[in-house]
Amino acid sequence: MIRVVEKGSDVALPFSRGILTRSITSVGIDVDLAYSIAIEVQEELTRKGKSIVTKDEIRKLTYQKLVEKGFKEEAKRYLFWRRFRKMKVPLLILLGGPTGVGKSTIATELAFRLGIRSVIGTDSIREVLRKVITPELLPTIHTSTFLAWKEIKGTTSGSPIIAGFESQVSAVAVGVNAIIERAKREGLNAIIEGIHVVPGFVDVKGEMTFMYMIVARSREDLEARFYERTRYSKRSANYYISHLDEIMEIQRYLIERARKFGVPVIENIELEKTIRAIMEDIMERTIEAMKKKGLDMLEEPK
């Protein structure tokens, strides 16, 4: 049996093809190919008579296998993410976007690939607030974001739909910011997703804090997503489609806010492309940040 140790540690764990496969798939390699590479790595270590190996040795061998198979970009990404995780730098990813655009699915997939255990939806925060704040005190949190405008009393300047939306967001953002503060204070990795992740309302300060605005390419795309969503939800697609005008107005508002605050806007057309765009953006920005500290995250293993 091959056992794996971290340099400078006495703890040895059994080599796991499953764990290595997940590491390889995190950079966009198909799971079947990733598993075959993991087997090749294990077989080569066995052939060399290795019973104890370091994680660095596994990283180096895996990197070489990816390069040999022509996956140079994937090898670079693999090298980066292994080194990033080894540094134990807390990572905070914030995903905003309109109702039904696929934020939860993206968050779950990102969490799997990056080994992040904490995924928090802002709808859960809103639900907690509904239990402690009465409708009489704050009516806009007791309805959907695209219907909150109906609870606004008196006249508003500008769009009533956006006024209602902002009213709900400003309340939920208090809880979102509290979670962000705790994650930063305790050095936790987390992904926070939801329509209430709005630039200007949510704190994005911090070197390893990344916000993205996920949007639909078109009204038709979003409508199709609502029909798909009903396969896993009790709520009818018609509920959302009957309010598509309001939802699209909120999307336009979110795009404007994102551009104003320099937050990347990503059209969620294909899940894999969206995941790759987010991970590559995090990688590129982190590489630049680490360069300023004199660290080369892409130095080839020796």
Swiss-Prot record:
It catalyses: (2R)-2-phosphoglycerate + ATP = (2R)-2,3-bisphosphoglycerate + ADP + H(+). Pathway: Thermoadapter biosynthesis; cyclic 2,3-diphosphoglycerate biosynthesis; cyclic 2,3-diphosphoglycerate from 2-phospho-D-glycerate: step 1/2. The keyword ATP-binding applies. Its EC number is 2.7.2.16. It is an enzyme of class 2 (transferase). Belongs to the 2-phosphoglycerate kinase family. This is 2-phosphoglycerate kinase. The lineage of its organism: Archaea, Methanobacteriati, Methanobacteriota, Thermococci, Thermococcales. The gene is pgk2.
